[in-house]
Amino acid sequence: MKPSDQDSRTMRAVGLTRYLPVDDPQSLIDCTLPRPGPGPHDLLVRVAAVSVNPVDTKVRAPKAAVEATPRVLGWDAAGTVEAIGSEVTLFRPGDEVWYAGSIVRPGSNAEFQCVDERIVALKPRSLDFAQAAALPLTTITAWEALFERLGLDADGADAGRSLLIIGGAGGVGSIAIQLARRAGLTTIVTASRPETIEWCRALGATHVIDHRQPLPAQLEALGFRQVDAIANFADTDAYWAVMCELIAPQGRICAIVENRAPLELGLLKAKSAGFVWEFMFTRAQFGTPDMIAQHRLLTRVAGLVDAGELRTTLRETLGRIDAANLREAHRRLERGTGIGKLVLAGW
């Protein structure tokens, strides 16, 4: 459908009404929905590009529920502000922005999306929409994990401290490596295939080790019996025991993947070590008083990108935003072997 064929009150979108395996053509469908109107703190954004993340496949995963109207997924976008709410102060129509959005509101796989200005920032000037869309969710996750949950300093005060990153080649790991390098941290990053090892090294990993082999022996060969902090962007359960073994006394572990079985926190007691979750949707989901922290975070990162200190983690653009391309993106994510980020751009 051409834009001129559309009623100005409607928009193109990709959604779901049933939760189905990704190979089912009905798992994600092209649809026409009412165009939303911004609330007081909202921006109405014309979406130009989106990225996909594991949260998309988790939300879409098969279950018995049925949606009366199509549910729109997608939590990574870049686009142009079309209209603003009555209390918006940070943006104006025409601004080019990037954001991840809120897990409890309609997502970015639509031609227009309403998003709270407090979790949005101007996109990097040096990136096009596709390059920018690859970054928001993973950047917020990595920044909050390293510099808020683990308490490391973003600007070098902790230079030389050791950080183990489990899952270095994925979307979050790819930006975490860059942030840690900039902070002067000594990173030990896990990867396994030649292409993922090279990717991690190119992003600035100090050391790369094989997650298919025992981690303690590989760390010891590099001169590390323990590490000051651990960021696990892969499987929390699978690495729990070894993380508890490798963390230094009074160190901290951060994870982002929900556990499948109870975690034995007692393994950390003698070391007075801490464990903390990172979920980048927390601020928007609960409307925390510091929601605007994500606006500031993305604003700062945009400056770092434009200064050449960080680079996009875009790996491949799969084509325009439609159901067929999004199903392919979900299919690739579910394989669990991706490098960097997948993006869709244009309608």
Question: Where is each model-derived feature located?
Answer:
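C-terminal capping/lid region of NAD(P)-dependent oxidoreductase domains
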Residues: 2-9, 307-316, 327-347
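Glycine-rich beta-strand-centered segment in the early N-terminal region that forms part
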Residues: 34-51, 61-104
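NAD(P)H dinucleotide-binding glycine-rich loop of Rossmann-like/cofactor-binding domains
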Residues: 100-167
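NAD(P)H cofactor-binding loop motif with strongest signal on the N-terminal glycine-rich segment
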Residues: 167-168, 235
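N-terminal Rossmann NAD(P)H-binding glycine-rich loop of SDR-like oxidoreductase domains
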Residues: 169, 173, 177
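Adenosine-nucleotide cofactor-binding segment
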Residues: 181-240
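Helix-to-beta-strand junctions that scaffold the AdoMet/dcAdoMet cofactor pocket
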Residues: 247-248
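C-terminal substrate-binding/catalytic core of Rossmann-like NAD(P)-dependent dehydrogenases/reductases
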Residues: 267-318
